[in-house]
């Protein structure tokens, strides 16, 4: 099966304090109307981070600051295998303008399940929620380290693992 390598920008209002995530509804093709994180194919000679910046410039006419890798999603569609590097991003300059998507929404943690995500993108939602759940409550951990910890333990009740005095 053919593998297609892509990137996705999980654009948040602030990488340091995530309260909203930007999502778009695909404006073309088989999955038209399905919700996704903006991004696209990695071109030859490009790093995944460079691809994120280029794709957001092409699709949304803005420049993003690329943060940490959230995860690499491996997903089998009927016709191809998708390998998608997903990065935290925030707008560095410009305003997000829809050049390819048919709609967009800023979603809070509570609203992330309110849209119909594309199959590969939906697999990332629990990890995003885990990182958003504890923002602002961390006092003794570096936010990046804690977010990484939350992602690794997203299938467990994190508050039972970490001493109560941290929250």
What are the roles of these predicted feature ranges?
Residues 63, 72-96, 103-105, 109, ...:
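Active-site-adjacent beta-strand/loop module that shapes the phosphate/pyrophosphate-binding cleft
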Residues 59-66:
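Short secondary-structure junctions
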């Amino acid at each position: 099966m053919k593998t297609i390598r892509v990137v996705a920008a999980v654009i948040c209002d602030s990488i340091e304090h995530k309260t909203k995530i930007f999502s778009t509804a695909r404006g073309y093709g088989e999955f038209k109307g399905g919700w996704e994180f903006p991004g696209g194919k990695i071109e030859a000679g490009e790093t995944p981070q460079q691809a994120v910046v280029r794709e957001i410039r092409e699709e949304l006419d803005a420049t993003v600051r690329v943060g940490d890798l959230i995860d690499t999603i491996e997903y089998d569609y009927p016709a191809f295998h998708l390998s998608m590097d997903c990065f935290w991003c925030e707008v560095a300059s410009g305003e997000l303008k829809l050049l390819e998507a048919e709609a967009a929404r800023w979603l809070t943690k509570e609203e992330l399940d309110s849209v119909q995500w594309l199959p590969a993108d939906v697999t990332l939602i629990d990890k995003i929620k885990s990182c958003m759940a504890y923002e602002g409550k961390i006092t003794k951990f570096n936010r990046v380290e804690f977010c990484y910890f939350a992602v690794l333990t997203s299938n467990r009740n994190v508050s039972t693992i970490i001493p109560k005095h941290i929250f």
